[in-house]
């Protein structure tokens, strides 16, 4: 079974084509257009042609006087055509940048300038073939649904037919858009057209909606801003009187829309200020923490209690400005109480930092800071006062050798704190006597040698160091203990009428940086018979063969330097250590005078005969190469 369409009435009705063009234009502009199309698509010409489509009935589901439902096979190869007009973007770089995020685009200046070209497209030689479900009803109109894609071929003629690339691109894009049109938009267009033809109620409803959307049909509209508000203000916020409002008109040049209600203006201003400054006008929001709050009730929450005028505290997060917590009173109390836990010195250099708390009550749950203090003050009473206190442990550094004399009882060399404004210098505890002529001559020779070369590594080139390693401290204590025992044996072997040898402290002279006649240091006076026992190196008969064991000489222990550092600086310490080594060297030379100097040098270490015997000098690297 087939149908014969009467195609002539559709071609003769001019209103039908007008309504069809409007519906097609709305349908083409409804979906999002590609970025190359920069203007609306307008249908300028529409002609269905003289050849009607062919329908073949496959199934009839319902048949009555006012309704029909069936499935058809449709074929169309007529002379219908459609003409469209739009504007396209001819610059592909501009089109590319429009589809990309501005953050990732190179932002060219001249190359991205748009070039808009008008475009006219004509669609002809349309060939359709597909299965159609047709439902007809006088009350509901005609509904046409395509079960498959009906478009087989299409010819596209445009302004850019001379450019093959553009022609192929337009052909591909338009075919894709028409396939969407036939499957989605064309059934809705046909349904609306059928309602206009057979449904009078629909036509009246459509006319009413058109009048609402187009107010020009009912005459000129009313200006909603013509009537001023009850409390009008101008653009500057000044309240206007009734006479000033009456003098205003739409033709006087004064804009009537500047008259707003004063209450509304205040609300808008408060809303704007709240977004800028987070002020009190901000409406309260649940479960939201304010980032700033400058009220007086919150300023006392900081632990320091001090507020800088340039940076007020952020009390909502319990921020406060950290101040220097170490003052002169703290330092005085620190010096007075030596056994108490001192304040950490680092707190005085903390600066003005911003410490943030976790919440409003973060101080109660704050984590305790570790207090790590190193006390380097001199304790003349005992060596146990040199303590290093940490947050969890404390340890005491004592002498590594308990059998040594009391002069060498420490293993650390503290730096002399000359910049301490609180702790006074400790006065010397022993009487200083005038040096002998021999000591002054030796001091002058040593000064000349020190002017030619620096103090070697054996005599304290690392004096400023704070700590001495335990092996070096053990060697020094052992050397000084051996020297003391040797001196004690020599005193026992002397006759009863001879005077005893001076102690190691008395023979070590001390000199100041700037000697003056009034404050010249006094040294112990030595007699020839007492000094010959350890200064002369030419009488082999005075030596005991049982005491010819080599003594390794090194610099003295650090506590001896600490005790003698009360009277001077680094030069005094170097001098004292050199003299102690010289005394030990002379005692060794007295015992080892008959032996080979080279062998004695190898056994005696680096301290024997350094200044007088160059052949016995040990091959110790310079101070710069020992670290």
Curated annotation (Swiss-Prot):
HAMAP family: Mdm34. The lineage of its organism: Eukaryota, Fungi, Dikarya, Ascomycota, Pezizomycotina. Component of the ERMES/MDM complex, which serves as a molecular tether to connect the endoplasmic reticulum (ER) and mitochondria. Components of this complex are involved in the control of mitochondrial shape and protein biogenesis, and function in nonvesicular lipid trafficking between the ER and mitochondria. MDM34 is required for the interaction of the ER-resident membrane protein MMM1 and the outer mitochondrial membrane-resident beta-barrel protein MDM10. The gene is MDM34. Component of the ER-mitochondria encounter structure (ERMES) or MDM complex, composed of MMM1, MDM10, MDM12 and MDM34. Residues 209-230, 332-470, 486-557, 586-627 are annotated as: Disordered. It is found in: Mitochondrion outer membrane. This is Mitochondrial distribution and morphology protein 34. Belongs to the MDM34 family. InterPro entries: Mdm34, SMP_LBD. PANTHER family: MITOCHONDRIAL DISTRIBUTION AND MORPHOLOGY PROTEIN 34 (PTHR28185:SF1). Keywords: Lipid transport, Lipid-binding, Membrane, Mitochondrion, Mitochondrion outer membrane, Transmembrane, Transmembrane beta strand, Transport. It comes from Blastomyces gilchristii (strain SLH14081). GO terms for biological process: mitochondrial genome maintenance; mitochondrion-endoplasmic reticulum membrane tethering; phospholipid transport. Residues 1-195 form the SMP-LTD domain. Lacks alpha-helical transmembrane segments, suggesting that it resides in the membrane via beta-sheet conformations similar to those predicted for other outer membrane proteins and porin. The SMP-LTD domain is a barrel-like domain that can bind various types of glycerophospholipids in its interior and mediate their transfer between two adjacent bilayers. Residues 373-384, 436-451 have a biased composition (Basic and acidic residues). Residues 215-225, 332-341, 390-412, 528-557 have a biased composition (Low complexity). It is a multi-pass membrane protein. Residues 360-372 have a biased composition (Basic residues). GO terms for molecular function: lipid binding. Disulfide bonds: none annotated.
């Amino acid at each position: 079974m087939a149908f014969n369409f009467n195609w002539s009435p559709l071609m003769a009705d001019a209103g039908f084509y007008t309504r069809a063009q409007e519906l097609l234009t709305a349908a083409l502009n409804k979906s999002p257009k590609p970025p190359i199309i920069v203007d609306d698509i307008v249908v300028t010409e529409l002609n269905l042609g003289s050849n009607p489509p062919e329908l073949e009935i496959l199934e009839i589901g319902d048949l009555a006087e006012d309704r029909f439902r069936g499935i058809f096979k449709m074929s169309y190869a007529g002379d219908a055509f459609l003409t469209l007009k739009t504007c396209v973007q001819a610059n592909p770089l501009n089109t590319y940048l429009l589809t990309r995020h501005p953050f990732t685009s190179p932002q060219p200046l001249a190359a991205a300038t748009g070039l808009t070209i008008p475009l006219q497209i004509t669609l002809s030689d349309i060939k359709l073939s597909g299965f159609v479900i047709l439902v007809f009803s006088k009350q509901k109109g005609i509904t046409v649904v395509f079960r498959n894609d009906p478009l087989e071929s299409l010819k596209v003629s445009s302004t850019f037919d001379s450019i093959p690339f553009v022609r192929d691109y337009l052909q591909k894009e338009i075919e894709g858009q028409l396939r969407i049109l036939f499957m989605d938009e064309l059934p809705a267009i046909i349904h609306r057209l059928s309602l206009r033809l057979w449904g009078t109620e629909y036509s009246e409803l459509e006319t009413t909606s058109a009048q609402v959307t187009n107010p020009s049909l009912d005459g000129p509209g009313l200006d909603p801003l013509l009537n001023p508000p009850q409390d009008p203000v101008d653009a500057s916020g000044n309240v206007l009187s009734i006479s000033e409002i009456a003098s205003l008109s739409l033709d006087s040049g004064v804009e009537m829309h500047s008259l707003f209600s004063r209450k509304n203006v205040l609300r808008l201003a408060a809303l704007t200020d709240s977004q800028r400054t987070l002020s009190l006008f901000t409406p309260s929001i649940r479960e939201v923490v304010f980032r700033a709050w400058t009220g007086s009730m919150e300023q006392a929450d900081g632990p320091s209690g001090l507020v800088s005028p340039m940076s007020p505290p952020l009390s909502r997060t319990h921020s406060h400005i950290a101040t220097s917590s170490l003052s002169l009173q703290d330092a005085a109390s620190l010096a007075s109480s030596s056994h108490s836990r001192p304040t950490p010195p680092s707190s005085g250099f903390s600066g003005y930092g911003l410490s943030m708390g976790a919440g409003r009550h973060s101080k109660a749950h704050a984590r305790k800071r570790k207090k790590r203090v190193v006390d380097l003050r001199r304790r003349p009473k005992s060596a146990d006062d040199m303590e290093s206190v940490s947050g969890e442990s404390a340890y005491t550094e004592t002498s590594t050798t308990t059998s040594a004399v009391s002069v060498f009882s420490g293993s650390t060399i503290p730096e002399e704190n000359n910049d301490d404004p609180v702790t006074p210098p400790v006065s010397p505890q022993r009487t200083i006597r005038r040096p002998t002529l021999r000591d002054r001559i030796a001091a002058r020779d040593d000064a000349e040698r020190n002017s030619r070369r620096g103090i070697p590594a054996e005599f304290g080139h690392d004096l400023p160091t704070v700590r001495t390693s335990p092996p070096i401290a053990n060697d020094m204590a052992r050397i000084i203990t051996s020297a003391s025992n040797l001196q004690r044996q020599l005193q026992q072997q002397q006759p009863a009428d001879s005077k005893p040898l001076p102690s190691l402290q008395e023979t070590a002279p001390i000199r100041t940086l700037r000697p003056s006649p009034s404050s010249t240091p006094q040294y112990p006076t030595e007699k020839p018979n007492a000094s010959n026992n350890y200064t002369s190196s030419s009488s082999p008969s005075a030596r005991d063969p049982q005491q010819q064991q080599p003594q390794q000489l090194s610099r003295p222990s650090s506590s001896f330097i600490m005790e003698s550092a009360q009277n001077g600086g680094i030069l005094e310490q170097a001098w004292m250590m050199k003299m102690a080594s010289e005394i030990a060297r002379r005692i060794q030379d007295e015992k080892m005078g008959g032996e080979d100097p080279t062998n004695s040098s190898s056994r005696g270490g680096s301290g024997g005969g350094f200044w007088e015997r160059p052949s016995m000098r040990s091959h110790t690297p310079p101070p710069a190469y020992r670290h």
